[in-house]
């Protein structure tokens, strides 16, 4: 029987995001983000929920870090709220906001946990939306780089591992739309698909300028990465033909050819640009050089995948619909395709052509229909099933020599799930939002045992 063992230096961690857990939305100089404003619009989030209080992590971080110690992780991925650091998006730095992250990081380090800081996880300052329309304007890339310089120069003596931006597609192509009101903040309708693609191009520019800013501002050695939620094409059989079809489909699946390809290769995928036609963004001279910064690692957020097979007509592949009754977790898009972790990693090395680039799974997990039983426990065996099968796929990638170096479960605790409010629970710790009590679920103990044994149990 396979042991599903990981290398001794494999990094086990957990991940969160600022707006989803911190709360304290108007404390210590923080000003509104686009998510504060979006959540205040009737009907935009389920039950009118917002992140104003969330998990109150801002006040409870010390006890949350103790949970991490109990779990056994040595790596924690969190995000820094731009509106806490530069409340107006540009200009003066709010040192009280910086001090919170200093306290958090110091607490992590005292407990032997390495901090991994994401500099942007969707909560851009509302002031920049009011001033020039956020990601519709190239100026945001420069303002983001200034904010990055400010926080890295202040935290770089404590934090070595920096992630620039989390999931560009979600706050651009799910936040802007030409023909409908988009589901994500700031929920902006624009005039054309080209304008939507311009927002993601500006986000790529922000990533590139942030890479430069991190390396210029860091007082010591640092590691720089991007976090992308690639769409993963999975061959329905591992025949030579179906593998080739999945690789052929990968640049054309969702936004891959226009996000991960320019970031990692310095060019939008040629076939993808042709597919976009007049919707392709305007690319100014020098943009691609800025976007294509050297990375020390790549973070992949992977939850599901799309099955693909070879066909005998153009384009040579077919993306397959899933049948009615196919297993799914507690989100409409969260189909159970555990091979996605293996193929996502393999596609970066082979399909994108970056076998040199170390990879971390920076998010993987699932929403489940968690309830407290009569004993006050959450026995989330569905989540354990999901995580076990995905981690087996990750271990396969390691065993075959692909450069997977670490894994961060999403998420440490139940939290504000964006437009779904508090209805969907992704945590391995149950959050009672009324009392702010934290209750480790069965999956918490299971994951702790994986970490303890350094293998999939």
What function would you assign to each model-found segment?
Residues 9-11, 58, 75:
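A common structural microfeature
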Residues 46-60, 136-138:
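Active-site mouth loops of central-metabolism enzymes
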Residues 80-93:
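Glycine-rich, proline-tolerant flexible connector loops at the mouths of alpha/beta enzymes
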Residues 1-45, 69, 88-90, 98-457:
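Active-site region of glycoside hydrolase catalytic domains
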Residues 60-81, 293, 297, 351:
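Catalytic domains of carbohydrate-active enzymes, especially glycoside hydrolases
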Residues 57-66, 87, 97:
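Internal amphipathic alpha-helical repeat/solenoid segments
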């Amino acid at each position: 029987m396979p042991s599903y063992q990981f290398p001794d230096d494999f990094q086990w961690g957990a991940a969160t995001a600022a707006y989803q857990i911190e709360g304290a939305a108007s404390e210590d100089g923080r000003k509104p983000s686009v998510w504060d404003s979006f959540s205040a619009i009737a009907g935009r989030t389920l039950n009118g929920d917002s992140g104003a209080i969330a998990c109150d992590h801002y006040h409870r971080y010390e006890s949350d870090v103790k949970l991490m110690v109990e779990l056994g992780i040595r790596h924690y991925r969190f995000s820094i709220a731009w509106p806490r650091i530069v409340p107006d998006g540009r200009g003066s730095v709010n040192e009280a906001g910086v001090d919170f992250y200093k306290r958090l990081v110091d607490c992590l380090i005292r407990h032997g946990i390495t901090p991994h800081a994401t500099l942007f996880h969707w909560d851009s300052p509302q002031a920049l939306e009011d001033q020039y329309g956020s990601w519709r304007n190239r100026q945001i890339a420069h303002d983001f780089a200034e904010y990055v310089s400010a926080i890295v120069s202040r935290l770089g003596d404590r934090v070595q591992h920096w992630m620039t931006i989390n999931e560009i597609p979600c706050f651009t192509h799910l936040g802007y739309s030409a023909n409908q009101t988009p589901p994500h903040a700031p929920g902006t309708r624009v005039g054309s698909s080209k304008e939507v693609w311009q927002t993601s191009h500006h986000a790529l520019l922000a990533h590139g300028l942030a890479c430069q800013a991190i390396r210029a501002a860091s007082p010591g050695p640092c590691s720089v990465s991007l976090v992308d939620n690639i769409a993963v094409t999975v061959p329905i059989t591992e025949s030579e033909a179906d593998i080739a079809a999945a690789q052929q489909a990968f640049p054309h699946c969702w936004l891959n050819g226009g996000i991960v390809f320019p970031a990692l290769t310095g060019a939008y995928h040629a076939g993808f640009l042709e597919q976009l036609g007049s919707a392709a963004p305007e690319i100014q001279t020098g943009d691609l050089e800025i976007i294509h910064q050297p990375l020390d690692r790549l973070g992949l957020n992977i939850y599901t995948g799309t099955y693909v097979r070879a066909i005998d007509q153009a384009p040579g592949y077919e993306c397959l619909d899933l049948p009615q009754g196919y297993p799914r977790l507690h989100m409409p898009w969260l189909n159970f395709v555990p091979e996605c972790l293996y193929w996502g990693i393999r596609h970066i090395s082979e399909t994108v052509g970056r076998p040199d680039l170390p990879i971390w799974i920076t998010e993987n997990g699932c929403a489940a229909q968690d309830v407290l039983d009569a004993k006050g426990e959450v026995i989330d065996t569905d989540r354990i099933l999901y995580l076990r099968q995905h981690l087996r796929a990750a271990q396969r990638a390691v065993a075959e020599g692909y450069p997977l170096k670490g894994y961060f479960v999403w998420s440490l605790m139940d939290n504000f799930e964006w437009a779904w409010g508090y209805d969907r629970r992704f945590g391995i710790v149950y959050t009672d939002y009324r009392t702010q009590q934290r209750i480790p679920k069965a999956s918490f103990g299971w994951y702790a045992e994986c970490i303890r044994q350094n293998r999939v149990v």
